[in-house]
């Protein structure tokens, strides 16, 4: 098993919406695990010339066989909303397609910004070669959410396991593996293949998420492992 810790420069706001909500709903403070796997799947699948859909699922579902866990963190974040111009012809009936005045509309969308425009992402995978595709990640979430890899560290999992039980972390952490303070609780889609289909009932896990101002203080439970890599502490579920 291998661990990759990546640091990204974020060039625009990150917008990842809660499942089954409108565009105007608040965005997640940090990209959920399914979004992180989707970001990794994009360069991976382009190199494989893969199809857009895979037996009714997003092609990103193929990575679930090798990617065990994913998480994101930032030293501080801010949640806000913005107004954007949206192309809407594709959502209208055909008689309206020739009307230029109906081509665009406006919408409010949620977004997250990060301190110094830095976002950290952790992947745990049994396939070392898959982690090389982190170098090809150029967007996280929507196509307009551009990022660039600044630095990456890839290690064998057994080389970065820590035996500390109490730790501070900027990464969201499943409530099932640790107890955290200075945190909020948010439910996010977990890495399950059903969450990569057109489901109306997404499968969610509950996570402790930093409050946006400071790292969380956590105590590891029996179902978790603590990884310390490049000066950061991240709790992951036991294998």
Which residue stretches match the model-derived regions?
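N-terminal ordered "arm"
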Residues: 1-53
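Short, glycine/acidic-rich hinge or "gate" loops at secondary-structure transitions
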Residues: 51-66
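Charged/polar, solvent-exposed surface patches and flexible loops
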Residues: 42, 59-62, 136
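Internal, well-folded beta-alpha domain core
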Residues: 64-239
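Structural preference for beta-rich elements and adjacent junctions enriched in aromatics
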Residues: 22-29, 56-57, 85-92
């Amino acid at each position: 098993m291998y661990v990759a810790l990546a640091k990204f420069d974020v060039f625009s706001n990150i917008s990842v919406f809660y499942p089954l909500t409108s565009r105007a709903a608040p965005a997640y403070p940090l990209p959920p695990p399914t979004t992180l796997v989707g970001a990794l799947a994009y360069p991976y699948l382009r190199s494989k010339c893969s199809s857009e859909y895979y037996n009714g699922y997003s092609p990103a579902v193929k990575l679930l066989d090798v990617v065990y866990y994913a998480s994101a963190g930032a030293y501080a974040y801010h949640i806000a909303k913005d107004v954007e111009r949206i192309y809407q012809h594709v959502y209208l009936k055909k008689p309206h397609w020739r009307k230029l005045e109906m081509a665009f509309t406006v919408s409010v969308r949620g977004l997250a910004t990060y301190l110094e425009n830095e976002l950290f992402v952790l992947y745990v995978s049994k396939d070392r070669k898959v982690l090389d595709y982190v170098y090809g990640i150029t967007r996280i979430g929507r196509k307009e959410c551009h990022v660039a890899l600044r630095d990456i560290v890839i290690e064998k999992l057994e080389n970065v396991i820590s035996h500390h039980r109490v730790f501070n972390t900027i990464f969201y952490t499943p409530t099932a593996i640790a107890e955290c303070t200075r945190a909020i609780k948010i439910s996010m889609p977990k890495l399950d293949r059903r969450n990569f289909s057109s489901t109306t009932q997404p499968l969610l896990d509950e996570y402790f998420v930093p409050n946006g101002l400071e790292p969380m203080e956590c105590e590891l439970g029996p179902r978790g492992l603590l990884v310390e890599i490049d000066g950061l502490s991240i709790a992951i579920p036991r294998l």
